[in-house]
Structures are given as structure tokens and as C-alpha cells.
Amino acid sequence: MRIDVLTLFPEMFSIFNHSIIGRAIENEFLKINTVNIRDYTINKHKKVDDYPYGGGAGMVMAAQPIVDSIKTVKKENKGKVIFLGPKGKTFNQDLAKELAREEELIFLCGHYEGIDERAYEYIDMEISLGDFVLTGGEMACIPIVDSICRLLDGVLGSSESYEDESFYNGLLEYPQYTRPAIYEGKAVPKVLLSGHHENIKKWRKAKSLIITNKVRPDLFKKYKLTEEDKKILKDFNKKL
């Protein structure tokens, strides 16, 4: 996948040079380019913002540098242009899966009080991280890009690595443990030490269902329980 990020602060995306995403870039599963919108302004003072017509607080990003940067990137990247803004569709795991199927994407990070409405003509989709205020689109873009890239073939090494994670299948993840087997008097559940893979799988599914119902009842309500799920829960409750 190729991703181009249009931003006023390209240095913020150096985080992608590290950890899982950094290795994916090194191994050429992924390419992430940052484009400084300021490089495209025709303003002699390199300004990319101005006061809003009609008055009001704050500044608005001008259409010209945004549009010109999009047009330039579009010469090589034919992907959807995605703007990170409050009016967009709320990002979730389903949307991450959808976008992970694309070969190319372009992300536009806004700043100040927003962008000139005329720039929207060049935007294909708007995405919001949630109902709260951030300093700029960069803050939303980083976790969104990370979430998408984790789903790409080869990035995590195994599909099981992300299929077991919270939200992937509509449920929160089961509890995890590592050595030592006993810490401060608290022991790891015996089933995890048993080596019985089928029982471990059932325990994890039961805990995932129970935790989701307790912590995120909204997610649990959307999840369609299978007959196998019901049996796993029934058997789990019998052992309590």
C-alpha cells in the first residue's frame, strides 16, 4: 500500500519509522510519504491560512495550497483523498478493514478552525476519530493510519495476530498473562497452563464475550451470538 499524508507538520509522522510500521516500511509492505502543504502556497510569506469571511474566531486554511498539493500528489497516487475532520464518519475497525483493501490512499490533515469549503471538491471522504476536539488532523491521522496498516498482509506476520485483537471480530480481547505463573499471590488461570488448545480457545472466547458484555454493552448488542457461543458461555458458567 502507498499512503501520502498532506500536512503542515510532516515531522510528526516520524513515529512511523519505528516498531511494527517501521519494519513494514523497511520490508516494502508499505510506503508512507509526507507532503508539506506549506510548500504549495503561492503566498510570498508562506502563509497557508487567513481570517474567515463573515468574521469569527481563529483562522481558516486556504483552499489554494490544499488543492495544489492534492493535484500534485494525485499525479502518482490515484487513491481516495480522506480529510480528517469533525463532520466525517466515525472511524472504527470495520472502516479500517475497508480502507485496508485499497492500494493507495491520501490523507489530508486540517489545522486551525478548519479548511476553506471550496477545497472539499477534491475530497472523497471525511473521517472523524470521535466526538472530541483535537489540535489538528495529524493527531487523528496517526492512529487511523496505524490501524489500517496493521491489517495489511505481511505487516504483523500472521493474520492471527490481529484477528484476536479487540474490535476485529466485534468483541473486546480476552485477558492476557505471561511469566511468572504466580505474581503477588495471583495465579494464571489453570486452563492457560494446560496445553489443551481447544479448551484454551473456548476459555478465551467466553472471557471475550463476558468482558464485552460488561464493559461495552453497545458492542455486545450488535454482536450476533452463534449457537457455539451460547454453548461456550453455558459451559463456562457451569464451571464457576
Curated annotation (Swiss-Prot):
Swiss-Prot/TrEMBL keywords: Cytoplasm, Methyltransferase, S-adenosyl-L-methionine, Transferase, tRNA processing
Cellular compartments annotated: Cytoplasm
A single GO BP: tRNA N1-guanine methylation
Molecular-function GO terms, alphabetical: tRNA (guanine(37)-N1)-methyltransferase activity
CDD domains: TrmD-like (cd18080)
This protein's GO CC annotations: cytosol
Binding annotation for S-adenosyl-L-methionine: 110, 129-134
PANTHER family: TRNA (GUANINE-N(1)-)-METHYLTRANSFERASE (PTHR46417:SF1)
Family per similarity comment: Belongs to the RNA methyltransferase TrmD family.
Assembly notes: Homodimer.
Protein name: tRNA (guanine-N(1)-)-methyltransferase
Organism of derivation: Clostridium botulinum (strain Loch Maree / Type A3)
